[in-house]
Amino acid sequence: MSDKKYNVDEGEIAKFSRIADKWWDKSGEFKTLHDINPLRLDYIDGHADLCGKRVLDVGCGGGILAESMARRGAAFVKGIDMAEQSLETARLHAALNNVADIEYECIRVEDLAEAEPHSFDVVTCMEMMEHVPDPAAIVRACANLVKPDGMVFFSTINKNPKSYLHLIVAAEYLLKFVPKGTHDWKKFIAPAELARMCRQAGLDVADTKGMTYHVLSQTYALCDSTDVNYMFACRPAF
């Protein structure tokens, strides 16, 4: 495998490419991401104050979070992903909705970290690490891309029986919130493991929050439990 393909799961790329035209369908395959986006946007903005910042969204997909951060007042947003079809959807949606100061590129985060080290005020990597072979490499690259006084945000899924029941058995098979095969439980990451990756990459975890889903209102809320979905807010260690 060439360096350009390292840490790229071709099966994951193909999976998301097949449904790339569905990214902005709020009742379709990506409904869960649309439901969770207001919460994660407020969490990021509350810690980092997006207004006037240079922001990188790693694993941006069709641009749901990237575009919302641009609308929130970021001076510049760059979204990167390895699924070109998803990026085409993101570019088209931004253009049709007159969202300025946003660009998308098909590039590995590891390569961008080599080309543009310490160049972003805010780096986000949300609901992405459970789809790659080497999440620790993603964490290291994010740490290398953020400015010394910036912030890095991660969100992913805990690895335990509860997350398996909630996000695979219930979400994929019973309630059909997401397509079958969206998640691979073996790739889920426990908070302690992600914290270890952050420390080894030179990041301090400043805050940890869980996310809980309210079925009736179809909204997410912050909570103290990290049993299923959770987020980290990190700062470069000094």
From Swiss-Prot:
Single GO term (MF): 2-polyprenyl-6-hydroxyphenol methylase activity
Enzyme class: transferase
One Pfam assignment: Methyltransf_23
Gene: ubiG
Protein family membership: Belongs to the methyltransferase superfamily. UbiG/COQ3 family.
Stated role: O-methyltransferase that catalyzes the 2 O-methylation steps in the ubiquinone biosynthetic pathway.
Entries under InterPro entries matching the protein: SAM-dependent_MTases_sf, UbiG_MeTrfase
Binding site for S-adenosyl-L-methionine: 40, 59, 81, 126
S-adenosyl-L-methionine recorded as keyword: yes
Name of the featured protein: Ubiquinone biosynthesis O-methyltransferase
Keyword Protein biosynthesis set for record: no
Gene Ontology terms: biological process: methylation
EC number: 2.1.1.222, 2.1.1.64
